A protein has these predicted regions:
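PIN-domain endoribonuclease scaffold, especially VapC-family toxins
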Residues: 1-71, 82-96
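Flexible glycine-rich beta->alpha loop in the catalytic core of nucleotide-sugar glycosyltransferases
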Residues: 79
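Acidic beta-strand-to-loop metal/phosphate-binding motif
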Residues: 73-76
Length: 96
């Protein structure tokens, strides 16, 4: 689980664009591996997961697809991530 891999698209959903409000998140991100590319295959898999789960944002679906196979997703949004992970290959969900 450590260090966490964080796709860059997650930054858009987790940051506010304000240094003061983002300070704690930025401290956490310094401990992470930031993944800046998503392959076409992973993007297609994310689209498939969204179709199968019938819920979740594109970013959530990409996070779950990147975690395949056998990864763990850390989230504060259990419902959508678990719905997507239910169709993924051995992806577990931990709520933080």
């Amino acid at each position: 689980l450590w260090p966490p891999l964080v796709p860059t698209m997650v930054l858009v959903e987790s940051l506010h664009g304000d240094a003061g409000r983002d300070a704690n998140t930025n401290r956490f991100l310094k401990t992470c591996i930031i993944e800046s590319t998503v392959s076409v295959d992973v993007a297609r898999r994310a689209a498939e997961l969204r179709r199968l789960a019938r819920t979740g944002s594109a970013v959530d679906a990409l996070v779950v697809a990147i975690a395949e196979p056998g990864g763990t997703v850390l989230t504060g949004d259990r419902a959508d991530i678990e719905a997507l992970a239910g169709h993924a290959d051995r992806v577990t969900v931990e709520v933080i």
